[in-house]
Amino acid sequence: MLAKISSSAKRFVHRSLVVRGNAATFPLSFSFCRRRAFSGKTSYDYREVLRTGLSDIELDDAIGLFGVMAQSRPFPSIIEFSKLLSAIAKMNKFDLVISFGEKMEILGISHNLYTYNILINCFCRCSRLSLALALLGKMMKLGYEPDIVTLNSLLNGFCHGNRISDAVALVDQMVEMGYKPDTVTFTTLIHGLFLHNKASEAVALIDRMVQRGCQPDLVTYGAVVNGLCKRGDTDLALNLLNKMEAAKIEANVVIYSTVIDSLCKYRHEDDALNLFTEMENKGVRPNVITYSSLISCLCNYGRWSDASRLLSDMIERKINPNLVTFSALIDAFVKKGKLVKAEKLYEEMIKRSIDPNIFTYSSLINGFCMLDRLGEAKQMLELMIRKDCLPNVVTYNTLINGFCKAKRVDKGMELFREMSQRGLVGNTVTYTTLIHGFFQARDCDNAQMVFKQMVSVGVHPNILTYNILLDGLCKNGKLAKAMVVFEYLQRSTMEPDIYTYNIMIEGMCKAGKWKMGGIYFVASALKE
């Protein structure tokens, strides 16, 4: 069997290297790695450090420890070096592990299968798959047979190296070589298949695992559920939950929360609530993510009473709401006209040391503007800037709209200039709001100036912009200019709507041009 595995493995390595044009051997001295200066004399005993564990070791201490170990005579065992390399790899410092592997070879310290596996994994994790394969070839020449850990590392390298067909072939070869793919193998391949938009193959792999005598575990099912939900395939995800139940595998809160969040995103809030009830009936306790997804979803769809009920339930269970929960509820209360409740939630956030985000601040600014509390809205803008939460165009648009509605378009223009100084570019909503604001203030010249500026900077007016401009011109006795704008609109790719025609008909009639108004009326009727 060993001979069979060895010959099959060598064929695999040879094909992977030669077909791809990679180097067929691994450099003896790891000469491709950068060299480091290692810390030398220190007073502590490396054995004591290794004995107490490396789970919390800092990077600088790990580098210093390697320096001490490299200068110790006799050398520490390869097992002790492996412990350190593994700890550094867990910090995602893959290049450093490879560099230390080079140093060990220079010092004459021979690697074993465990260190080879660590190094192969590091090459794969930093997208140097050709060198991982070369190192595999070298270790096999030295008499080390790859184990399932080696091959799983290579599989991960193929999946993340845009070689998904090679990854699938590797799993088949593993069986031919006498290896039994485990849940890590299949879960890695599932991640890779989703990474390359092969969802149906990933789902089919669950059945394939069972056929090969490898029962998928919670992690494997979780990987498939997560991949399906990211694509919006919630029906398939729900079917998979049923498969798990049939296989006597209990879904955990992470899997349920993933599906609930996906159902919420695709407007299946009732299905999400039903699944929430189902998970509770099965004894799975929802967490803050589960609640936040549902509360945010229900608020978005105007189901505030359901959202409030869930919040009460959440607090009763001593599950602390997070930023998402608070922000969703604040926005919901603002839209419902209950600013006092929104403010209380904001105060509760601050008490709990939860920093508001741009969405939270923008919602509150909108609430203040709706009630004409513009001073407080401006103060909230200044507060968010002081807190290094920089406003975006939506935030400024909300405040500009508030001032324009209050017939304080001059303040709106100040805010427009302020946002421009911050490097933010006004959009169609910004300019349309200002045009409307100037017309409300009976400042026809500045309204036209803003429109011209809008066009000159490449911001495209929409039909609402044109309707506001035409209405403002007609009501301010500038019918001739309105006619020019209307004719331009007709020549453009944008279609006038019923409101456009009504504005022009009313303008014509007010100016005593009844005949022309009648023509526009007929045109609007034909339009309908």
From Swiss-Prot:
Chief localization: mitochondrion
Keywords for this protein: Mitochondrion, Repeat, Transit peptide
Thylakoid in keyword set: no
Record carries keyword Mitochondrion: yes
PPR repeats: 77-111, 112-146, 147-181, 182-216, 217-251, 252-286, 287-321, 322-356, 357-391, 392-426, 427-461, 462-496, 497-528
Domain of life: Eukaryota
PROSITE patterns (alphabetical): PPR (PS51375)
Organelle transit peptide residues: 1-20
GO cellular component labels: mitochondrion
UniProt subcellular location: Mitochondrion
Family (UniProt): Belongs to the PPR family. P subfamily.
Entry protein name: Pentatricopeptide repeat-containing protein At1g62914, mitochondrial
Organism: Arabidopsis thaliana (Mouse-ear cress)
